[in-house]
């Protein structure tokens, strides 16, 4: 398929284990219905016609992935991930080919709504820096005393946002910012933080709060509820 300006490659870092799920199986391979979380995640990305390819970064020798239908999907490319998320994302970017923009999405975030994805992708028409899906903070935020479960003070929530994924950036810009940040020992918690480190200010695109990341055991049932509701609404 010829690459055009509108083509987008998604990168899904899936080399992590997720110990907070308290399971022997990495969380991306836990099942919701008849599919794994990873399969739901990839399906949500490929549902948008602009996403023509998905690069999945997995742990070397990951036998669980090899057993999935995704392993033989014509739009899926697999690469070995690294020890840290940023290393896996860089490996995915290098395999993305000659696309102008890349979309990075958590492997364990299966409830991405198609409207959110479409609005995020639309910023490529107006932005040279990119942006992320995010949700305004709604709860009162407290900062704890260092190392203690005691309140130090209340944090003003005005202008505070929860960073979500996908995060969407020009491919070369994200590659260069991640590389520089890693080389200089910066703490990179998501892709946007690499751009921030290099002096850029990505856009915040408001997304749905039900775009949850499956992190703890109780998240699994919640994700199943959201996916079931989304399927019902699409078929209504």
Curated annotation (Swiss-Prot):
It comes from the Bacteria. The record marks 157, 213 as: Positions MEP for the nucleophilic attack. SUPFAM superfamilies: Nucleotide-diphospho-sugar transferases. Transmembrane segments: none annotated. The record marks 20, 27 as: Transition state stabilizer. GO terms for molecular function: 2-C-methyl-D-erythritol 4-phosphate cytidylyltransferase activity. Belongs to the IspD/TarI cytidylyltransferase family. IspD subfamily. This is 2-C-methyl-D-erythritol 4-phosphate cytidylyltransferase. It comes from Enterobacter sp. (strain 638).
């Amino acid at each position: 398929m010829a690459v055009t300006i509108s083509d987008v490659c998604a990168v899904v870092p899936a080399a992590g284990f997720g110990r907070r799920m308290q399971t022997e199986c990495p969380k991306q391979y836990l099942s919701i219905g008849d599919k794994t979380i990873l399969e739901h995640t990839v399906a949500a990305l490929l549902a948008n016609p602009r996403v023509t390819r998905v690069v999945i970064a997995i742990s070397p020798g990951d036998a669980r992935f090899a057993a999935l239908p995704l392993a033989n999907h014509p739009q899926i490319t697999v690469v070995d991930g690294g020890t840290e998320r940023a290393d896996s994302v860089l490996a995915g970017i290098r395999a993305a080919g000659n696309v102008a923009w890349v979309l990075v999405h958590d492997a364990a975030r299966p409830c991405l709504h198609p409207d959110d994805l479409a609005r995020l992708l639309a910023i490529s028409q107006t932005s040279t820096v990119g942006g992320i899906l995010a949700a305004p903070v709604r709860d009162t935020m407290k900062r704890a005393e260092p190392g203690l479960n005691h309140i130090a003070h209340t944090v003003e929530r005005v202008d505070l946002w929860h960073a979500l994924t996908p995060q969407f950036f020009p491919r070369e810009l994200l590659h260069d910012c991640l590389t520089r940040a890693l080389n200089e020992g910066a703490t990179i918690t998501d892709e946007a933080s690499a751009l921030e480190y290099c002096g850029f200010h990505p856009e915040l695109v408001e997304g749905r709060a039900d775009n949850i990341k499956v992190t703890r055991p109780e998240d699994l049932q919640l994700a199943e509820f959201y996916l079931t509701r989304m399927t019902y609404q699409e078929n209504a």
